[in-house]
Amino acid sequence: MDAHEDYVWPRATSELILLPVTGLECVGERLLAGEGPDVLVYTLDFGGHLRMMKRVQNLLGHYLIHGFRVRPEPNGDLDSEVMVAAFGSKGLRIVKISWGQGRFRELWRSGLWNMSDWIWDARWLEGNIALALGHNSVVLYDPVVGCSLQDVPCTDRCTLSSACLIGDTWKELTVVAGAVSNQLLVWYPAAALTDDKPVVPDRRVSGHVGVIFSMSYLESKGLLATASEDRSVRIWKVGDLRVPGGRVQNIGHCFGHSARVWQVKLLENYLISAGEDCVCLVWSHEGEILQAFRGHQGRGIRALAAHERQAWVITGGDDSGIRLWHLVGRGHPGSGVFALSFKSHSRPGVLKAVTLAGSWRVLAVTDAGALYLYDLEVKCWEQLLEDKRFQSYCLLEAAPGPEGFGLCALANGEGRVKVVPINTPTAAVDLTLFPGKVHSLSWALRGYEELLLLASGPGGVVACLEISAAPSGKAIFVKERCRYLLPPSKQRWHTCSAFLPPGDFLVCGDRRGSVLLYPSRPDLLKDLGVVSKVGAITSAPGAGSGEGEPSLAEWGPMSTLPSLHGKQGVTSVTCHGGYVYTTGRDGSYYQLFVRGGQLQPVLRQKPCRGMNWVAGVRMVADGNMVILGFHANEFVVWSPRSHEKLHIINCGGGHRSWAFSDTEAAMAFAYLKDGDVMLYRALGGCTRPHVILRESLHGREITCVKRVGSITLGPESGVPSFLQPDHLEPGEPVEPGSEGPGLIDIVITCSEDTTVCVLALPTATGSAHALTAVCNHISSVRAVAVWGVGTPGGPQDPQPGLTAHVVSAGGRAEMHCFTIMVTPDPSPPSRLACHVMHLSSHRLDEYWDRQRHRHRMIKVDPETRYMSLAVCELDRPGLGPLVAAACSDGAVRLFLLQDSGRRLQLLAETSHHKRCVLKVHAFTHEAPNRRRRLFLCSAATDGSLAFWDLTTMLDQDSPALEAAADLGLPFQLGSPCLTVQAHSCGVNSLHTLPTREGHLVASGSEDGSLHVFVLAVEMPELEEAVGGAELLPQLQVLEEYSVPCAHAAHVTGLKILSRSLMVSASIDQRLTFWRLGHGEPTFMNSTVYHVADVADMDCWPVSPEFGHRCALGGQGLEVYNWYD
């Protein structure tokens, strides 16, 4: 551990933070957002949208910003210059800003004033500022000099949970304090006869049964709103609070939140509340819920602001997201459910089915065989035709397209299908396709060129009809093109179909949950070279499309994914962007693609919680995707991007006839209820006119951070070049992304919210872009491991981008393996696109159920958690990498990845530690003229480290590989090569670095200590081997040092950067650098970061001009950089 050169002390600077948004304030046409100690400034552009203007870093030091107060100007002009007080915790700072003409300049900044108590509210009073402190006192402060002018306490020196200051002068200043006794205390600081003499409360207001977290006063109407822990919002009639002795009356008690209410704001016509349930509710002053905004994830909405003139509501959440919502009248017009009044004496029969032809025409059929049309422009019902052959049992489907192409199809229980032109129903065409019941109908449309109708009959036969129109447009031609045969099942009919571009294939879903691939034209099979894979069976006589017509061959599927969506069936198939999206009643939707005429699953995703019936997928105008489905008795349109329920219709559930249509002009949903047709229609289509000012990261704590690699983008990717500093005027703002492409680091984070997120972190802009999220886990994700990092196309044909294999693991002993491919894409703001392919998954309890010898095994506790992962890449050809997992049940398990990650199986295990294993770390040892040795280090809650030699276990004749081939009991690793008692309690961080002497090993513990030692690997001489047997290497500790009080809390991150430098991170929120090489590690310097409860850290070198980067994950994400 000798240092050969003096090391320059690194100075870490914060480059990026993604923390809960705790403060929001609208100032004229600008928005101020507080994120940690930083301020984000947004400005309103000419298009009426907010855009990012500036980030002011570290304004409040080590305090979190909880609020802003703007000093009112005599002329009311806040568009050019403004004086802002930012406060939070015990800190206060005043800053004067110039932001006119789109340029941001900081003119003056006061010192950071530290108060003696928590600041709950602040208010400007004639150049000074009044502060309401945490134990029911008020301080009048001079922000320029930085001194207290007056300090007046209340006689009730209780702890406050909130406070509100009212008034413009010291004489009329009123304090409304929310005490821990659940009361509101109203008192007047100016009533104090002398300074520091307590003031008796003027009024005490009771009503809530929990502490009060927020309050808002509307002076024009004399109303006060309070939000409480009891999940309610109360409205009080208080009159002018600046006048003592007034009467307080509770005029509203609003229940609508399912958890604690954090924030409340009173407007002239609305009351806005937001809480721990991640819902923002808009109320009338009478207590009626007018709107509900859902989209944030995690533990709630922490900040709330409103812009009355623009009719905006802005929310900031624990998920680091900022969202802008439109109030009623500006946001979501034309929505609502209304009955179409079908019941009439002139329309006999009972409605059996309903469908939509576009978004403004409704079709319905009765049990009398009558087909009716309702035009939303004419607003009346019209009978198109009546056919007694379609009474009792009748199917109805309208052709897809903006206005349904003016076609619909009927089918009955006798094998008859009728294709009806809606505008000329007398030109309907009848066909008898089957000798029995038609089970289902579906349409398949290829642009405006080809339209097919598929009908399922008895025996799994699907007739494919080609529909074309006459040149006059008044007649249609229907021709049976071919027949398909479904795989055998109990309920043997198809449920949906779609063309796969460019149109050579049809993708179908069936009732047993399978996804099938058929040729759209059987005569194309010869050109595709897949004739031998598809069987053709001649149909039985009499099963043709008409009397005397020749029988058609029934073509089997080219590719099948059996029971992909379980036993409830596939509900929709959609093709977009080269992928196939399927949905089902198993509560999931799949992304598939076709390669070589075969269907291959890419990714399985789940929509919002509780949507067990996923009905469809739609691509909207902005390029995003929305999911349709049923959540209990409600039909829901859900956005995966914003995690928001865009539309909610209480229809009674999906076990009824319903139809959905979406165009850019409007969205429509029709369903049958109480013998009538109900229609929900919303102008503007599926989308909602709200703005995501900043994307969410994770809804819960980040548990692991792992850097994958880096990508360099240039002008060919549509990214502008670097701007030289002399091209910018002093103080000119730099747009995010305009600093140039530079280097972009790809980082993977996982969280307690069960998601794995892929982030792009540009080195030049100090921003973060969420590329994609993987939501396959059913419980929290605790660890991520990466291997096989490369470029698209492989070494032979490298292309711009990055590819990698990823393994994620966490709660419920669940592990998933997938690949990511990040490629340049000029469309999104990140200039990158990320494609994910799920390869395999593994759960210990499911693995146990499949074993033949499970009676000889102890069933694994289903609550077992994987705490840490390590990938051991092998040099043996034909054998995939090993994944080592630290398990909470005291075991260390080794999994073998085969077939490029598509097979994941348990290979070996050991229960040496007999207690929860917290960390695993793999490293290799290479000696001259010797084989490469693979070692694994594991650490447990007793502070011990165990070292295992995995090389011998992976030999050609190893019993571990024989057990893997036999899929029997996992191989037992036995005893470790070396055990080191490094700490007195759990080891939360572990890292190694190869040196000339062996390996430098460092660990950090829950007691805040560090342990560093040199591990020597002694290889036996070749002459010592007798009879060709290989002698095992000997491990021993050469030097060993400990730092007992390196941190004040758990050390959760540790990285040996070089032989002379180490960096550690702890829950005490300090990033500390240590000098190695001179005995005990020596403290160099420390930087305070703002992420609370840090769970993991990753560091990597970037380049000589950018130095090192370090990502810290906990309750948020923060990225630091330093230069060597």
From Swiss-Prot:
It holds the Pfam family WD40. It is found in: Cytoplasm. The modification N-acetylmethionine is found at residue 1. One of its GO terms (molecular function) is tRNA binding. Disulfide bonds: none annotated. Keywords: Acetylation, Cell cycle, Cytoplasm, Repeat, tRNA processing, WD repeat. It comes from the Eukaryota. PROSITE patterns: WD_REPEATS_1, WD_REPEATS_2, WD_REPEATS_REGION. GO terms for biological process: tRNA methylation; wobble position ribose methylation. Its main location: cytoplasm. GO terms for cellular component: cytoplasm. WD repeats lie at residues 53-97, 105-143, 147-189, 200-238, 247-285, 289-327, 335-376, 381-422, 425-470, 476-520, 557-596, 602-640, 643-682, 743-789, 852-897, 905-950, 974-1015, 1039-1076, 1082-1124. Interacts with FTSJ1; the interaction is direct, and required for 2'-O-methylation of position 34 in substrate tRNAs. Interacts with IRS4. Interacts with STK11/LKB1. PANTHER family: WD REPEAT PROTEIN (PTHR14344), WD REPEAT-CONTAINING PROTEIN 6 (PTHR14344:SF3). Belongs to the WD repeat WDR6 family. Together with methyltransferase FTSJ1, methylates the 2'-O-ribose of nucleotides at position 34 of the tRNA anticodon loop of substrate tRNAs. Required for the correct positioning of the substrate tRNA for methylation. Required to suppress amino acid starvation-induced autophagy. Enhances the STK11/LKB1-induced cell growth suppression activity. This is tRNA (34-2'-O)-methyltransferase regulator WDR6. It comes from Bos taurus (Bovine). The gene is WDR6.
